[in-house]
Curated annotation (Swiss-Prot):
<dbReference type="InterPro" id="IPR008422">
    <property type="entry name" value="KN_HD"/>
</dbReference>
<dbReference type="InterPro" id="IPR005541">
    <property type="entry name" value="KNOX2"/>
</dbReference>
<comment type="similarity">
    <text>Belongs to the TALE/KNOX homeobox family.</text>
</comment>
<feature type="region of interest" description="Disordered">
    <location>
        <begin position="1"/>
        <end position="23"/>
    </location>
</feature>
<dbReference type="GO" id="GO:0003677">
    <property type="term" value="F:DNA binding"/>
</dbReference>
<keyword id="KW-0217">Developmental protein</keyword>
<dbReference type="Pfam" id="PF05920">
    <property type="entry name" value="Homeobox_KN"/>
</dbReference>
<keyword id="KW-0539">Nucleus</keyword>
<feature type="DNA-binding region" description="Homeobox; TALE-type">
    <location>
        <begin position="253"/>
        <end position="316"/>
    </location>
</feature>
<keyword id="KW-0238">DNA-binding</keyword>
<dbReference type="InterPro" id="IPR001356">
    <property type="entry name" value="HD"/>
</dbReference>
<keyword id="KW-0371">Homeobox</keyword>
<feature type="compositionally biased region" description="Basic and acidic residues">
    <location>
        <begin position="214"/>
        <end position="229"/>
    </location>
</feature>
<dbReference type="GO" id="GO:0000981">
    <property type="term" value="F:DNA-binding transcription factor activity, RNA polymerase II-specific"/>
</dbReference>
<dbReference type="InterPro" id="IPR005539">
    <property type="entry name" value="ELK_dom"/>
</dbReference>
<feature type="domain" description="ELK">
    <location>
        <begin position="232"/>
        <end position="252"/>
    </location>
</feature>
<comment type="function">
    <text>Plays a possible role in patterning the placement of lateral organs along the axis of the shoot. Mutations in RS1 alters cell fate and causes unregulated cell division and expansion in the leaf. Probably binds to the DNA sequence 5'-TGAC-3'.</text>
</comment>
Amino acid sequence: MDQSFGNLGAGAGSSSGGSNSKAAATAVSSSSFLQLPLSTASPAYYGAPLALLHHAAAAPSSSQQHQQQQHHHHYARHGAEMSAAEAEAIKAKIVAHPQYSALLAAYLDCQKVGAPPDVLERLTAMAAKLDASAAGRHEPRDPELDQFMEAYCNMLVKYREELTRPIDEAMEFLKRVEAQLDCISGGGGSSSARLSLADGKSEGVGSSEDDMDPNGRENDPPEIDPRAEDKELKYQLLKKYSGYLSSLRQEFSKKKKKGKLPKEARQKLLHWWELHYKWPYPSETEKIALAESTGLDQKQINNWFINQRKRHWKPSEDMPFVMMEGFHPQNAAALYMDGPFMRDGMYRLGS
């Protein structure tokens, strides 16, 4: 059932109310109480009388009663089966229910969300009257009506929460922005002073006798530099974050040159170099271990050893015999690709 609170019960199936249920459904079409979605489990029998709750909440006058009579005539013209007496009886049964005041209070709470102050005051006064008139309501137990009243009270409470959530989120956002602005400006004093200066002319601050020249003419207010606010904001930002900016500047000035390895990694590579100076060609397994210990990748390690051998290592003349000691086949590829004898050793010896 996709209806509004003003159309409660319209188009619903038959219920335990019998003929009253069909009559209640026809009394809904031209009345409106709340434009709210309904639960499909709500009974149809008590749907139509809720279209009259809005009138009961505001103490109906004779003109309102006359308007209700016009509604009944309108229903009769369209073949409605509910008489005015039946509608009043069902309405009286709902009004006499102990939860009737809670239902109207929940409805008024929905109306209060985002309402202007004057409307909020009137709604609060109306809610106070409802609380005063709530005492003394007694009605025989009617499980169907009890279920209906409880369901719609809960629905209105949830609807009010949905209405309030975006407003609360907006207020929280504004508070955060205000706190950030106060933090940037070093407090609310300077911003308040700027606002007072900007609004001073419109509030008549410059119309006192102190602002009059000897000829009786009003002195013009001093000109305000439009960039003064930006300068003040810049000053406040520098004052607050100068230490952080200086540390960043020092960090950038100490930034390593491109391609230079970290000191700790170079020390570990040099340590391995000293231990294997006679044959400084690490195997693939040793390269993986060095990469894990230094935090470098394979390419960095390969480049470091190539450059290190070019600059600081020269094989001796008897190297072809010495290097066979502890030599294993996987180093042959590295020996060939690196070409130590062609580039560093034998080439220079033969040149």
